[in-house]
């Protein structure tokens, strides 16, 4: 490879080379010069590749293949919007057919194959571009050449594909594909390989040396570097300070943070921030640590610069100022204290402190006696001398201390003592002269009192208190000499005492002035003594040191005491404020407490004065679980305390909550509605097909739930309500009207919940028909009523005024009633409903209560349907008879002993008003009732005993035992809402049944 082949300056270098040869070989013979020129011409005749238009370095953005768009065309370096240019090459020294192969190589030497691909409209395949050069111009212009970048994970595959087509211009191999991090994906170079045609036409096997272009950078990564914001513009000289830098988009693999310092336009120090590629966030934020400054012992902040630098091309951003602060920055108090302690040996300070403490402990406290005749400066002069003496002793006892310091201190103390002695001597001389003048004036006044009296008004500066002396003396001159002498002596004595007082006041004023002057001199800055150093060190240890503040001296004890007094006063003030705050808090608390107590007392007083609510004390809200006793419409006043069980504890603890779950039953005798007067029963009309709809204003109360397990018994109660039996009275008296709620629309509707272990009431009320009965009932549906199939009596439509009184299976039945052809018989009959649809039997109901007919109505027969018996199982001639004529067991007029015992245990009356109480049930129900009685009363009855109807009646007339507190829950039917009605006792039930039957 020749120099002119690697760059585009070959033509321009020719003259320079010739000139250089002529200069170098001027002294050679002409023949040698001709030979050299001939060899140079031969070299020039060898063809080579020249790049006439370099590609633009930062004008193109590399596109990924997944972006699905054109990579764009690489413009030329001299391209403008008006005159666009493109990369161009030219073959020099050859004219003929030739082919050029263009591929991407790395930016740095050695030039290795780059994984990025070249794409274009023509000639581009497998990442390289192959074109035939124009043989006339020997120039090739690449006007449609783009760069398509690959991802890091695809580098190895791209280089492997390049290896398969054997495109390796500089024979460097493809081993770098296993080191993807060593490849700069943001910059490439274009490599041009030219192959000339050989002697065989169509075969280009003569290669020329390859040439490479200038680097081409990805415009996305090579954008302008800009620092937008720095979280801090200063750091300590130690470095390692974390800084967050915000910038424009940068490539995290090709960015660095540069710190540098310049002096006189030249860089004297340079360092780079420490960070990893993972510290670059979204290409717009860099978190790095500052480098260590080259000098640590700086006292002033050092001004440096910070900038972004791109290592690939060396481009830098605009430099911003940055400061390196001293290592004690932000710690002035600590470092100043440290330096102050290092000025003098620490042993000197500590020894001085210990010596003074020991001296204070040994010497007893002394009382200072102040002489008014002697100035206080003498006392103050003793303190430096004492300190000097102590210092000399310390120097003698500690020879290891520095002698220079002791000499300086001695000289200073001597000079101070001499100055103070001279000053005190001058002051004492002035005081003596002043006193002598005063004494002379006093003696002169005593010798010549009369002359003194005349001269006193002129001497007001000395004594203004005796200005009135001439007036007194002139007023008291006696006539005789003795009186004059006595008066003169008295006046002299008075004047002497006044003069002494004046002298004392003058001396005191002078002494104060001297003290103030001396104190002002002492407060002037001067070298520190041992005590000064101790005091300053103690204050600095408390972090109270201030720069250039004069240290307190031993003579300023008065100021220290005043400061202590002010601190004590301040502490006292703080304590007083605290006490005041506590007193205020206590007062507020007391007021609030009194207000709260008064409020409670007022409320209690208001409650006491308020009229009590009209609430019946006898009402027991826990008694609602006996809701089945409310069987009739009109209420009856009943003494609740005698019948109802006591209130459970939970109702007392949470009465409000109890009212949320059930409705109280109000029993008021005044609210009773007048009973409908009994009217005679009209004669039975012929059968008329009419549909009886039950009234909607009243509903039967639900049955009591079982107390064995907590469950929602509403479904069972609804099933029981829908399946009841009515008795047909034989008299014309009209009974009470009761109406059922509307039946469900679904004929197969069943509300019984599924229970794994059904209880007593579930077994008693939910017995179903057998399959043979259901099959037989479908055949005879046109003749028989659906209730006959289930053998279950019902009081779904009970109306004493209905001439065709009969039983329906449920309120769902809409078929007409068929009256019994034998009106003399008053027993309940099974009505026939031709054409009715057979309904699914529901739970058995034993809520029907009837009275046994008198003797003339076959009173010795108790009708108890046995298990398995039905109307279908009876002979055909008996189907039209009443229910009392079918499948009965004659018990007789009396009850057996076991039955009577069971009834007595259950507190059930056996007979009332010449009649016996009966009920209808099957054998399984009787067995369940016996088990219930045995469990409640703790007795053992005969398992084979069949209870009579009277025992079943006791199930609804007796009061259930007291409910446990655990049964008071929301799902229990004990608290189901019921309609207002009256609760009847067994006696009242018997009386009403007798009246209904005409007894």
UniProtKB/Swiss-Prot annotation:
Biased composition regions of type Basic and acidic residues, renumbered to the chain: 710-719
Keyword Membrane attached: no
The keyword Transcription regulation appears for this protein: yes
GO cellular component labels: cytoplasm; cytosol; neuromuscular junction; nucleoplasm; nucleus; subsynaptic reticulum
CDD domains, sorted: IPT_NFkappaB (cd01177), RHD-n_Dorsal_Dif (cd07887)
Compositionally biased tracts (Low complexity): 402-424, 819-829, 836-851
Biased composition (Polar residues): 720-734
Motif (Nuclear export signal): 668-677
Chain location of the short sequence motif Nuclear localization signal per the record: 756-773
Sequence segments annotated as region (Disordered): 1-44, 389-424, 670-851
Intracellular or extracellular location(s): Cytoplasm; Nucleus
GO BP of this protein: canonical NF-kappaB signal transduction; dorsal/ventral axis specification; dorsal/ventral pattern formation; immune response; innate immune response; melanization defense response; non-canonical NF-kappaB signal transduction; peripheral nervous system neuron development
Gene Ontology terms for molecular function: DNA-binding transcription activator activity, RNA polymerase II-specific; DNA-binding transcription factor activity, RNA polymerase II-specific; DNA-binding transcription factor binding; high mobility group box 1 binding; identical protein binding; RNA polymerase II cis-regulatory region sequence-specific DNA binding; RNA polymerase II transcription regulatory region sequence-specific DNA binding; sequence-specific DNA binding
Keywords: Activator, Cytoplasm, Developmental protein, DNA-binding, Nucleus, Phosphoprotein, Transcription, Transcription regulation
Ranges of residues in domain RHD: 47-342
Modified residues (Phosphoserine): 312
Tissue: In unchallenged larvae, expression of both isoforms is seen in fat body and gut (isoform A is more abundant). After immune challenge levels of both isoforms are enhanced.
Disulfide bonds: none
Compositionally biased residues, Pro residues: 677-686
Top-level taxon: Eukaryota
Functional description taken from the UniProt entry: Embryonic developmental transcription factor. The lateral or ventral identity of a cell depends upon the concentration of this protein in its nucleus during the blastoderm stage. Acts as a morphogenetic transcription factor that specifically binds to the kappa-B-related consensus sequence 5'-GRGAAAANCC-3', located in the enhancer region of zygotic genes such as Zen, Twist, Snail and Decapentaplegic, promoting their expression. Part of a signaling pathway involving NF-kappa-B and Toll-related receptors, that functions in the apoptosis of unfit cells during cell competition.
Subunit structure: Interacts with tamo via the nuclear localization signal. Interacts with emb, a component of the nuclear export complex.
Protein name: Embryonic polarity protein dorsal
Species for this entry: Drosophila melanogaster
């Amino acid at each position: 490879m020749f120099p002119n082949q690697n760059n585009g300056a070959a033509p321009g270098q020719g003259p320079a080379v010739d000139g250089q040869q002529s200069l170098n070989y001027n002294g050679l013979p002409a023949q040698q010069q001709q030979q050299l020129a001939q060899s140079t011409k031969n070299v020039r005749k060898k063809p080579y590749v020249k790049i006439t238009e370099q590609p633009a370095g930062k004008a193109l953005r590399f596109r990924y293949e997944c972006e699905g768009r054109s990579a764009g065309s690489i413009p030329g370096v001299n391209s403008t919007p008006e005159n666009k240019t493109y990369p161009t090459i030219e073959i020099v020294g050859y004219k003929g057919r030739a082919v050029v192969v263009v591929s991407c190589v790395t930016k740095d030497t050695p030039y290795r194959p780059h994984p990025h691909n070249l794409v274009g409209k023509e000639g581009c395949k497998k990442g390289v571009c192959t074109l035939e050069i124009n043989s006339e111009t020997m120039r090739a212009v690449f006007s449609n050449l783009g760069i398509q970048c690959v991802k890091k994970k695809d580098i190895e595959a791209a280089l492997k594909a390049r290896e398969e087509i054997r495109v390796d211009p500089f024979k460097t191999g493809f081993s770098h594909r296993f080191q993807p991090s060593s490849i700069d994906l943001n910059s490439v170079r274009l490599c041009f390989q030219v192959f000339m045609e050989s002697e065989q036409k169509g075969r280009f096997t003569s290669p020329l040396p390859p040439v490479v272009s200038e680097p081409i950078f990805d415009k996305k990564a090579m954008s302008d570097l800009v620092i937008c914001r720095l979280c801090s513009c200063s750091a300590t000289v130690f470095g390692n300070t974390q800084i967050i830098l915000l910038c424009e988009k940068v490539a995290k693999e090709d960015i660095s943070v540069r710190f540098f310092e310049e002096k006189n336009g030249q860089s004297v120090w340079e360092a780079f921030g420490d960070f990893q590629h993972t510290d670059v966030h979204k290409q717009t934020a860099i978190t790095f640590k500052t480098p260590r400054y080259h000098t640590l012992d700086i006292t002033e902040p050092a001004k440096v610069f910070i900038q972004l630098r791109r290592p690939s091309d060396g481009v830098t951003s605009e430099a911003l100022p940055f400061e390196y602060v001293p290592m004690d920055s932000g710690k002035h108090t600590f470092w100043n204290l440290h330096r102050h302690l290092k000025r003098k040996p620490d042993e000197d300070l500590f020894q001085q402190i210990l010596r003074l403490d020991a001296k204070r402990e040994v010497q007893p406290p002394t009382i200072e006696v102040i002489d008014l005749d002697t100035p206080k400066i003498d006392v103050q002069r003793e303190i430096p001398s004492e300190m000097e003496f102590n210092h000399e002793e310390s120097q003698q006892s500690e020879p290891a201390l520095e002698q220079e310091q002791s000499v300086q201190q001695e000289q200073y103390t001597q000079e101070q003592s001499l100055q103070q002695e001279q000053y005190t001597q001058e002051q004492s001389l002035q005081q003596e002269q002043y006193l002598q003048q005063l004494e002379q004036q006093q003696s002169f006044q005593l010798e010549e009192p009369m002359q003194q009296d005349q001269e006193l008004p002129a001497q007001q500066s000395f004594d203004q208190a005796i200005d009135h002396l001439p007036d007194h003396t002139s007023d008291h001159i006696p006539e005789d000499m003795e009186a004059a002498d006595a008066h003169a002596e008295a006046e002299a004595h008075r004047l002497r005492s006044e003069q002494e007082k004046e002298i004392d006041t003058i001396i005191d004023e002078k002494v104060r002035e001297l003290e103030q002057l001396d104190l002002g001199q002492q407060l002037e800055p001067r070298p520190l003594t041992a005590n000064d150093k101790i005091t300053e060190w103690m204050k600095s240890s408390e972090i109270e040191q201030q720069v250039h503040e004069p240290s307190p001296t031993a003579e300023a004890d008065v100021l220290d005491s005043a400061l202590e007094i002010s601190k004590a006063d301040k502490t006292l003030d703080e304590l007083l404020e605290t006490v005041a705050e506590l007193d205020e808090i206590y007062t507020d608390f007391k007021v609030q407490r009194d207000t709260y107590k008064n409020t409670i007392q007022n409320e209690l007083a208001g409650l006491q004065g308020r009229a009590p609510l009209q609430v019946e004390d006898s009402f027991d809200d826990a008694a609602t679980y006996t809701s089945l006793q409310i069987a009739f419409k009109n209420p009856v006043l009943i003494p609740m305390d005698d019948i109802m069980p006591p209130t459970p504890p939970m109702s007392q603890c949470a009465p409000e909550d109890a009212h949320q779950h059930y409705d109280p039953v109000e029993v008021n005798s005044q609210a009773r509605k007048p009973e409908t007067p009994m009217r005679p029963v009209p004669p039975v009309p012929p059968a008329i097909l009419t549909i009886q709809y039950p009234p909607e204003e009243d509903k039967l109360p639900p049955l009591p739930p079982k107390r064995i397990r907590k469950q929602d018994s509403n479904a069972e109660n609804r099933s029981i309500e829908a399946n009841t039996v009515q008795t047909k009275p034989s008299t014309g008296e009209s009974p009470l009207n009761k109406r059922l709620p509307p039946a469900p629309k679904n004929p197969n509707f069943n509300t019984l919940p599924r229970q794994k272990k059904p209880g007593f009431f579930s077994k008693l009320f939910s017995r179903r028909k057998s399959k043979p009965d259901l099959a037989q009932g479908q055949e005879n549906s046109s003749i028989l009523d659906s209730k006959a199939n289930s053998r279950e009596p019902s009081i779904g439509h009970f109306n004493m005024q209905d001439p065709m009184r009969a039983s329906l299976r449920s309120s769902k039945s809409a078929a007409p009633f068929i009256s019994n052809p034998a009106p003399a018989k008053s027993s309940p009959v099974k009505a026939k409903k031709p054409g009715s649809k057979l309904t699914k039997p529901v739970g058995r109901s034993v809520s029907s209560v009837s009275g046994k007919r008198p003797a003339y109505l076959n009173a010795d027969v108790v009708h108890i349907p046995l298990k398995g018996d039905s109307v279908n199982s009876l002979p055909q001639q008996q189907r039209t008879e009443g229910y009392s004529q079918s499948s009965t067991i004659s018990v007789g007029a009396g009850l057996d002993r076991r039955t009577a015992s069971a009834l007595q245990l259950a507190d059930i009356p056996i007979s009332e008003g010449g009649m016996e109480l009966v009920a209808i049930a099957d054998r399984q129900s009787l067995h369940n009732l016996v088990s219930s009685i045995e469990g409640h009363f703790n007795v053992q009855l005969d398992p084979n005993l069949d209870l009579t109807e009277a025992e079943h009646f006791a199930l609804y007339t007796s009061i259930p035992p007291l409910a446990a507190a655990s049964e008071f829950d929301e799902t229990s039917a004990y608290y189901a809402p019921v309609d207002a009605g009256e609760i009847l006792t067994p006696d009242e039930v018997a009386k009403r049944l007798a009246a209904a039957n005409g007894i």
